[in-house]
Each structure stands twice: as structure tokens, then as C-alpha cells.
């Protein structure tokens, strides 16, 4: 059986393997939760902020002041990025067997020919020590 996997389906697999199996075999879909409007609003604000710097050909100060971001730039193909940022269209990769990884990106940094996907994390509480290990 071939699968189309997204970040949310992988989270479902981690949270509830049975729910994942039932979903992927079209038996039952777990009800969705309340839409997180505050994080969604922050996501839009961050995208507008990054686009201002993309238009100037610069990195935003949050990144240009980070030593790990030296020689990086924001992906500059606005039309392609708009598609990849859309949850319904996004970007996909298919393996040799036909399984698909699919999702939307928040932003992309470029280093030579390599792409680095940025995933904005918005939450209403301070980061914990082990937060980075979850990603």
C-alpha cells in the first residue's frame, strides 16, 4: 500500500499509531481540533516580515546576526515559494515505491544549490531545554 505522508500525518502516527492506520486505510478519520488562529496570525506576520527583506535581497536581522546563517540567502523565486507555502498545494517528494512526502513550507534559505526549510514555531510559552530535539 502506498502512502501520502505530511507533517500532520506523521504526528498522528507518533501520537496514535492506531488512529494513523485507520486513517491511511480509509476506515476512520480522527476529528480535527480547534484551528489555532493566534499561531496562524503570527505565521502571516512572519511571512510578511521575511518578504520585506527578500525584496531587498537581505536576510532579516534575526538571521543575519546568527553565525550559522553566514553565506545564506532567502529563496528568491516568489511564485514558486507562494505555491510551496500553500497548504493545499505545497511541495512533494516521491520515493521509488511511490510513497509521497508532502507539506507546505514557511520559508526557504538557500546555500549554494542546497535548500534549508524554515519552519516557524509560534507558541505562547518559553522554549524548553529539549525543544530543538523534537524537530
Question: What residue spans do the PLM features occupy?
Answer:
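Short N-terminal secondary-structure initiator segments
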Residues: 54-73, 114-116, 124-129
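Structured catalytic/translocation cores of nucleotide/phosphate-coupled proteins
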Residues: 1-12, 18-24, 99-103, 107-111, ...
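A short acidic/basic microdomain associated with nuclease active sites
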Residues: 59-97
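Mg2+/Mn2+-dependent nuclease catalytic core
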Residues: 85-86, 90-135
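A generic structural signal for solvent-exposed, polar alpha-helical segments
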Residues: 26-27, 56, 81, 90, ...
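Nuclease catalytic cores
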Residues: 2-65
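Detector for Asparagine
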Residues: 11, 26, 51, 65-66, ...
Amino acid at each position: 500500500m502506498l502512502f501520502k505522508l505530511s507533517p500532520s500525518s506523521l504526528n498522528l502516527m507518533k501520537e496514535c499509531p492506531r488512529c494513523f492506520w485507520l486513517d491511511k486505510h480509509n476506515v476512520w478519520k480522527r476529528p480535527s481540533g480547534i484551528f489555532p488562529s493566534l499561531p496562524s496570525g503570527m505565521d502571516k506576520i512572519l511571512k510578511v516580515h521575511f518578504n520585506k527583506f527578500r525584496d531587498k535581497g537581505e536576510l532579516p536581522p534575526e538571521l543575519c546576526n546568527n553565525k550559522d546563517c553566514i553565506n545564506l540567502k532567502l529563496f528568491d523565486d516568489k511564485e514558486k515559494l507562494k505555491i510551496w507555502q500553500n497548504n493545499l498545494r505545497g511541495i512533494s517528494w516521491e520515493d521509488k515505491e511511490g510513497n509521497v512526502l508532502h507539506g507546505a513550507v514557511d520559508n526557504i534559505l538557500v546555500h549554494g544549490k542546497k535548500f534549508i526549510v524554515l519552519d516557524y514555531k509560534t507558541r505562547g510559552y518559553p522554549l524548553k531545554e529539549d525543544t530543538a530535539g523534537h524537530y
